[in-house]
Amino acid sequence: MTTNYIFVTGGVVSSLGKGIAAASLAAILEARGLKVTMMKLDPYINVDPGTMSPTQHGEVFVTEDGAETDLDLGHYERFIRTKMTKRNNFTAGRVYADVLRKERRGDYLGATIQVIPHITNAIKERVISGAAGHDIALVEVGGTVGDIESLPFMEAIRQLAVELGREHTMFMHLTLVPYLVAAGELKTKPTQHSVKELLSIGIQPDILVCRSDRVIPANERKKIALFCNVQEKAVISMKDVDSIYKIPQLIRAQGTDDLVCQRFGITAPAADLSEWEQVIYEEANPTGEVTIGMVGKYIELPDAYKSVNEALKHAGLKNRLSVTIKYIDSQDVESKGTEILEGLDAILVPGGFGDRGIEGKILAAQYARENAVPYLGICLGMQVALIDYARNVANMEGAHSSEFSKDTKFPVVGLITEWIDGDGNVEERTEKSDLGGTMRLGSQLCHLAKGSKARELYGNATVEERHRHRYEVNNNLLPQLEKAGLKISGLSADKKLVEIIEIPNHPWFVAAQFHPEFTSTPRDGHPLFEGFVKAAGENARGEFEK
């Protein structure tokens, strides 16, 4: 099979939505029956985003095989059916680390190691390997054209276009066409300069996707085509929309996928976008609304919880409910009290690290438990629910996690020192292990208890979900917690680790050690989130007994 490549770059400013644009095109191509994959090349020196601050970089998206990756891979999985792996995202840091490791082993036989050819060759090898077995691979290069960090990646994709042949490669460049109110017109000059910058490193774009707050008229598109040396039909107007799930239809209407198929000589049926039409219909026609409080510590950057945000919206679609997320700083719960949680239809505590705001999260779980408010805890959100239950129901005064209190009498949550990974191998960790790449990561099997809400929601006895944590429930204290009424409704493959807890005498209180948000999609949703949002709707309608 010959793989064709679409290299996606961005110019003018960052955060234009290269990932969304690329994923939307990928969704259309997939809807035409083609086997599509996507890749993200990140120019930063970190080996992966696993230890980067969520308030700087956004969330870390975890793949099935346990790779800690850029949040754009979450967009990819939400738009196309292909599952991402560790091969679909790599950084400059990863490439340099691999090249230096080979140099230390003597693999280069004494050669002087340089950016060209050694680094660029390593990039090309990873791109080819990650794209193997697919009809089309869309490869997104992070950053903005002109950034010094991205130059090795730009050079690598330029070389790939030469080596693979232009009949098997395309360049799609995303730019900004701003509207100046004072002048009363759109300005194309930034796009022209961005393409000029791209040309200076040997890359001629084949498709220009132009972001704007309005439709770019034909005369402006013609002007862009003339000065940027592209076909007029290859200048795609991508105006701002109220839902990212409308973008596949937006670019399909302009024949973008036809340009791709013509270039690669592919004959494929017309795109069937009926699933996306259904998503758009459900989003535009809710029958009610709910407000869900998300109590976290990274709320100044909503992208820190990107997959959770999207999963709540997906669940809203399935329940025909408009979901409003109210972001609440857990430190505010500590300082202002739980009064700020009043009026919410449901409460969600997402994952996180560190002790800042931890007591606020525990208070949020306690408030939901005591006031019959639907509660969904994810990762740390399960652990704080457990701590609250231990302290205030099981009479374990001062109970805490050993992550935050080394001398607590009741360490209901502790460091996992040994577990079985998804491949059946034994993993071991200690307090002295590195922070990066040492957590329990990736998809793991979970056994669901009979009669549990979790089993009812999933409709199966087992399920696989993705993990990212190094602390777990302390099994030594489980008997005391269960005696006090806590229900363990999910266990790991070897049945040694607690994966899900529930409170049976509560209308809807479920908390999971794993991250269900990573497998939610707009077309399919996710059972836990669907059940949670449904419960929020029932609470909003006054159907819960307080």
Swiss-Prot record:
Notes on how activity is controlled: Allosterically activated by GTP, when glutamine is the substrate; GTP has no effect on the reaction when ammonia is the substrate. The allosteric effector GTP functions by stabilizing the protein conformation that binds the tetrahedral intermediate(s) formed during glutamine hydrolysis. Inhibited by the product CTP, via allosteric rather than competitive inhibition.
Active site: 379 (nucleophile), 515, 517
EC number(s) given by UniProt: 6.3.4.2
UniProt superkingdom: Bacteria
Binding site for L-glutamine: 352, 380-383, 403, 470
Residues the record lists as binding UTP: 14, 187-192, 223
Entry's Gene Ontology molecular function annotations: ATP binding; CTP synthase activity; glutaminase activity; identical protein binding; metal ion binding
Family of this protein: Belongs to the CTP synthase family.
Subunit structure: Homotetramer.
Name of the protein in its database record: CTP synthase
Gene name as annotated: pyrG
